[in-house]
């Protein structure tokens, strides 16, 4: 009973939905694929590349360089303090150096 109901309910919407979508999309896509889709693809590629390059330029030149310097200086200070405060635990300094190098 349950299996038969789930199959019938799942098959009917897919068939009806698939026919409606294909029937409507064939008329629109026939026109859009020839004239509008290449234009949309080109515009989308240009805008997408422009945004990605624009963001990368800002982050790589200004922000990341400054942030890396700040982190590097702060990490040096923290290393000295941690090493002076914890002379016995040398493993902590090594793990912190590895973390700083990753950034």
Curated annotation (Swiss-Prot):
CC terms in the record's Gene Ontology section: nucleosome; nucleus
Region (Disordered): 1-103
PTM remark: Proteolytic processing into mature chains is required for histone eviction during spermatogenesis. Transition proteins (TNP1 and TNP2) are required for processing.
Bias kind Low complexity: ranges: 18-29
One GO process term, biological-process aspect: spermatogenesis
Keyword terms: Chromosome, Developmental protein, Differentiation, DNA condensation, DNA-binding, Nucleosome core, Nucleus, Phosphoprotein, Spermatogenesis
One Pfam family, short name: Protamine_P2
Cell location: Nucleus; Chromosome
GO MF term (any one): DNA binding
Compositionally biased intervals (Basic residues): 49-103
Residue stretches of biased makeup (Basic and acidic residues): 8-17, 39-48
Tissue: Testis.
InterPro entries assigned: PRM2 (IPR000492)
Domain of life the protein comes from: Eukaryota
List of residues that carry Phosphoserine: 8, 10, 37
Function: Protamines substitute for histones in the chromatin of sperm during the haploid phase of spermatogenesis. They compact sperm DNA into a highly condensed, stable and inactive complex.
Complex and partners: Interacts with TDRP.
Membership in a protein family: Belongs to the protamine P2 family.
Name used for this protein in its record: Protamine-2
């Amino acid at each position: 009973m349950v299996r038969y109901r789930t199959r019938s309910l799942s098959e009917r919407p897919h068939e009806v939905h698939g026919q409606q979508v294909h029937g409507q999309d064939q008329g629109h896509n026939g026109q859009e694929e020839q004239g509008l889709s290449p234009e949309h693809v080109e515009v989308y590629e240009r805008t997408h590349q422009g945004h990605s390059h624009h963001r990368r330029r800002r982050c790589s030149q200004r922000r990341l360089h400054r942030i890396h310097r700040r982190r590097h200086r702060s990490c040096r200070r923290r290393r000295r303090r941690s090493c002076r405060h914890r002379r016995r635990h040398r493993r902590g300094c090594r793990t912190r150096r590895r973390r700083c190098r990753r950034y």
